């Protein structure tokens, strides 16, 4: 098995770090099996049958919960062993009760590591073949609309959720709808990459703008309504956005900017957090919110519109945000970050604006639903006609531009198709209450499918390389290969989604900032030591040669 990627200190650090976890996990599984065997024998002897069964279930449940979500730590008040020691010390000492209680977390870590190994094998070795991309418009559209039809037949759902604002079944821009929205866009986005469907470039730019719009809309709604600016909430959001991408960068020796959507969402999430978190106690005042919106626009104008400011601000972060495409080595390191973030520099603010006026629009829709039939039909028909007209002119005079020209207009016009879609998707109460749950399910794992596609669906073969090839598990049978690789790819993406949330619950406590800080410092110390040790092991032999 030949590798196209050199062994790096980061990769070696992961290997060294996972070895003790494997040992601890195997030992915990053995302890759990031994406990189960003893319990089974006791049950067969009919001694205290009911009490033992209850205790067994209770202990297994506790292994899932892990005391306040506070990382690897004791969950049972009856746990034996040095409970006064920190979780890290108990892990190093292989404390039996601790390992049994955290068996499922250890198992999740191992499963995640196995999936990272699969990433590496698929994209950095010659174990599997690769094939070239091929685009056929008829096949592309056939596959996409086939998925839509299957989704409509098998997963069409009518929702009756109540609005958190009015308590009525208005459901304007409800969660089911936005998840479905993300789902059908993500499918087209991924197929665009798989088939190299260059003619849909402008559409993909709009889809990415929609994702960033949702970042502004969703985060503003959460922080404005719940007023939760806690450290735990912030850490959970950063974990969700960056956990998988960080390990992908380490294991595969890629730059953070290769997965540009992750830093984009992280940046705009931080900007929403800062906008509402600063002077948060005054957020109920309309004048303060207006000033914050104005300040956001001013910041964007200064950073992205004034030449030289972006480079001046971001140059200290070149190590993190820099990217050198092997196919375009002549470009500046910050070019990719400047280009990608600049395309959607305003749309996150538009998302915040829509979120702020969401209750107002919902109240208008509530009143409209209670109006007379003729008036209701007239208003909805007018809205639909206006939206369709605006959408048509945008399509004819903006969307049809060549991609270089379109990119110049995109930051200022991407809100138009988004608004048109929102108007048409929410035109009637029944229509906005429908969703295709298969697409909504895909919409929940967009981050995982985005990152995974680079390595287990497509192939680059080299660090920081764009995925120009396809992973080929069934050579010479492109459609069978598409079916097999897609099935594996989607299944793994879903598992990564679940594992990310499982480990987030384990290591980020929701109500214990002290434990969160402890976990963070412990992780930094461990990672630093592992990297330093790995760096020495790799560097010394090279200097001796």
UniProtKB/Swiss-Prot annotation:
Residues with glycosylation annotation: 129, 426
Cystine connections: none
GO BP term, example: xylan acetylation
Chain positions with Phosphoserine modification: 45
Tissues where the protein occurs: Expressed in cells undergoing secondary wall thickeningin a SND1-dependent manner, such as xylem cells. Slightly elevated in the inflorescence stems. Mainly observed in leaves and inflorescence stem tops, but present ubiquitously.
Function of the protein: Probable O-acetyltransferase involved in the acetylation of cell wall polymers (both pectic and nonpectic polysaccharides) and of xylan during secondary wall biosynthesis. Catalyzes the O-acetylation of xyloglucan. Seems required for infection by the necrotrophic fungal pathogen Botrytis cinerea.
Identification of the protein by name: Protein REDUCED WALL ACETYLATION 2
Lineage, opening ranks: Eukaryota, Viridiplantae, Streptophyta, Embryophyta, Tracheophyta
